Amino acid sequence: MEIQVVDNNVEKAIRVLKRKLQQEGLFREMKQRKFYEKPSVKRKRKEKEAQRRLRKKMRMMKKA
C-alpha cells in the first residue's frame, strides 16, 4: 500500500493511511491474530458475522 505525502503534510497522509487500513479490515485482523483462536471458535465467529451481514442486507432491501 502506498500513500503520497503532498506538500509535506504528513498528518494528512497518516489519516489517509489509517482510513485505508480500516477499510481493508487490517486492524481487526491484527486484533484477531494477537491470540490463537481455536477452529471451533473461529467457525462460530464467522457464522455470526455472516448472519449479521445477512440481517443488514435484508434491512437494506426492506428500506428500498
Curated annotation (Swiss-Prot):
GO cellular component: ribonucleoprotein complex; ribosome
Renumbered residue ranges of the record's region Disordered: 37-64
Keyword Ribosomal protein: yes
Compositional bias per record (Basic residues), positions renumbered to this chain: 53-64
InterPro entries noted in UniProt: Ribosomal_bS21, Ribosomal_bS21_sf
Gene Ontology biological process terms, A to Z: translation
Pfam families for this protein: Ribosomal_S21
GO terms, molecular function: structural constituent of ribosome
Keywords of this entry: Ribonucleoprotein, Ribosomal protein
Listed HAMAP family: Ribosomal_bS21
Stated family: Belongs to the bacterial ribosomal protein bS21 family.
NCBIfam families xref list: S21p (TIGR00030)
Protein name, as recorded: Small ribosomal subunit protein bS21
